[in-house]
């Protein structure tokens, strides 16, 4: 209902304000600038399926700010060199890949009502494109990890995650592009990301 929507909006704004106030003073202006720069992409995305062949790219850019803003909050700058750049690019490729899979579930309905998606635009090459996106994301993360001098313990986690991504692509088929398959694929990407995060944390504390 409208009332529920307003309540949720007020709660989200309250928590957002709390997060902003929790950011170190020296980082706050840069974080707010990045958040402002992300707004055009966030506002464009809901309508992008009507006028852009690859709306998933806009969503990927939105997700990319989830790398830039925490980095800015931690370092008070974007001077992260190759590590930051490649983490950002990896996020964009990874997001484009799994959201393309998610778009496969809506492919028939989107065609019926004249909407666009990367799944429709890529057609038969969509699964191959997802595989390439995952490979590029893994490769970029490997370079970023190397430049960040992560410990040896990270690399088994990276290898398992990389193989896991490609396994998920292998399990996709033209006969199983339904909501359930796409949802499971999306959930497994969360698990793979959590595995990578665990590897990063362990490499810093062991």
Regions picked out by a protein language model, each given a short descriptive name:
Residues 1-35, 112-152, 158:
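Multi-pass membrane catalytic core of lipid/isoprenoid biosynthesis enzymes
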Residues 18-27, 67-74, 90-101, 144-148, ...:
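Alpha-helical membrane-embedding segments
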Residues 13-16, 39-42, 63-64, 91, ...:
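Residue-level recognition of pore/gate-forming positions within transmembrane alpha-helices
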């Amino acid at each position: 209902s409208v009332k529920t929507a307003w309540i949720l909006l007020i709660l989200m704004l309250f928590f957002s304000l709390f997060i902003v106030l929790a950011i170190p003073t020296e980082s706050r202006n840069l974080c707010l600038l990045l958040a402002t720069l992300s707004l055009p992409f966030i506002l464009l995305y809901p309508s992008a399926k009507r006028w852009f062949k690859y709306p998933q790219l806009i969503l990927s850019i939105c997700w990319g700010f989830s790398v830039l803003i925490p980095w800015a909050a931690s370092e008070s700058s974007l001077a992260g060199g190759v590590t930051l750049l490649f983490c950002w690019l990896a996020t964009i490729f990874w997001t484009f890949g799994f959201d393309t899979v998610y778009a496969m579930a809506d492919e028939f309905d989107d065609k019926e009502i004249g909407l666009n998606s990367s799944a429709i635009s890529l057609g038969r090459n969509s699964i191959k494109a997802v595989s390439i996106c995952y490979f590029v994301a893994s490769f970029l993360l490997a370079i970023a990890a190397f430049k960040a001098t992560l410990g040896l313990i990270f690399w088994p986690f990276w290898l398992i995650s990389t193989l896991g991504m490609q396994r998920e692509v292998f399990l996709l088929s033209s006969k199983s592009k339904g909501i359930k398959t796409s949802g499971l694929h999306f959930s497994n990407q969360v698990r793979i990301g959590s595995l990578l995060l665990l590897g990063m944390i362990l490499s810093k504390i062991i």
